[in-house]
């Protein structure tokens, strides 16, 4: 019993179709262009990268030496890499004692430079210090930072690149009877 693909796939009753020859084996008539396959095009003097640096090895095969060698990549532990990056960052904390409301701009400028500020309100009255805290709170919201009340007159203002932990945040400690 002979195995037939046509009978297996149900094509035993199908008519056979004849396909024309693609013409690669025929000699072209004069005036007609000869078909060119893609391998014949690749043996020209130009490489894909645009360099004219093709050489032939001892077997006669053409190769392109115009490529640029990529730098070697090595796997780096992400925790080591982040530790190295954090060591390179210069972190500063500015200490500031405002005397007038216009000093709030200096505090906000430090915050915009991604630097934390410790503000001592001992040299200014309560209404002015409350206005400064309100002004700075808007900037803190804009940069997604945080504000922490350290004592009645001292506040820590930090941008989002500082992690502040501990109890007694400004939002929790402020009430109707709070100074600010």
Swiss-Prot record:
Pfam families: SepF. Gene3D superfamilies: SepF-like protein (3.30.110.150). Residues 12-23 have a biased composition (Acidic residues). Keywords: Cell cycle, Cell division, Cytoplasm, Septation. Its main location: cytoplasm. Belongs to the SepF family. This is Cell division protein SepF.
